[in-house]
Amino acid sequence: MTSVGIDVGGTKCHGVRLDDAGAVVAEVRYPTPPADQLVEVLARMFSELGGTTSLGVGVPGLITPEGVIRASPNMPGAFNVSVGPALRELLGVKVHVENDATVAAYAEWKVGAAHGSQNAVMVTLGTGIGGGIVMGGELQRGANGFAGEIGHMMVERNGLECVCGRRGCWERYASGSALRTLSGGMSGEDVFAAAARGEAHAQSVVAEFTDWIAVGLASLTNICDPEVIVIGGGVVQSIVDVMDVVSARFAEALYSPEWRQHPRLVTATLGERAGAIGSALISSLA
């Protein structure tokens, strides 16, 4: 059976239709609308993709099991938006709504870099940090559907203020926006290029940034004990040349490294399609 999935991003909505073999056979993109127009745009995209008996949607933020957006920092005004219930009523099909990083993790686990594993964590390093967790072959959602908000894992008590209103969140130290702050406004590409040329300031920034990435990955490993950690998001292209440094610092930060098999650190393979593909794959769970 074909499936349709839509990934809602901060600037665009990306929809795909998958055939029975899981290949993308149709795509459509729309600018992300204001929160009060989101349901209408998602319904239009679903129709343009040909429709089917179910729809999967990935949305940034805190999503309830019923498909209600409780809060989404990257979508102004998106508080208590009833996406799932409204789409079910409007389209007359089954609708499954999940956090966007969770559906990307599901895609990488089912058909991407973590395929074949039973225990995996995906970390998306972008403007912020998102994630998804698979344990025992099951996607983990938690009691309220909020599992995987790893960017708001506290790594420094009373540290830098986060957009969530708290302090010391991991994404304030290991995200794309954190790298820009650390470097004094440089892009990730420019920072790593300068470090490769031997510029001392850039090398210091990269050392601190990779250390914060490693600290967070080690904490996730100590909690989840995964076989593989998939790293995706916009920052991954910048750090790919220093993954050996990240891996070494990650190993140093692990609890009881001599008694455990270290999880593999791999980069995501599905690119910007991961969220939409994961949404389509997860639609069958509706």
Predicted segments, located by residue:
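ATP-binding/phosphotransfer module of carbohydrate and carboxylate kinases, centering on a glycine-rich
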Residues: M1-S54, I63-V68, P85-V93, A107-S117, ...
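Short beta-strand segments
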Residues: D7, G56-P60, E98, M122-G128, ...
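Conserved A3 ("GATE") glycine/threonine-rich loop of ANL adenylate-forming enzymes
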Residues: T11-K12, V103, T127-G130
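Short hydrophobic alpha-helix segments
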Residues: V28-Y30, P73, A143
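A charged helix-plus-loop insertion that forms the helical arch/lid used to bind
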Residues: V68-N80
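Glycine/small-residue-rich loop that forms an oxyanion/phosphate-binding "nest" at active or ligand-binding sites
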Residues: S72, H96-K110, M122-V123
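Adenylate-forming
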Residues: A104-K110, G130-I133, H152-M153
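Structural signature of FAD isoalloxazine-binding scaffolds in flavoprotein oxidoreductases
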Residues: F146-E149
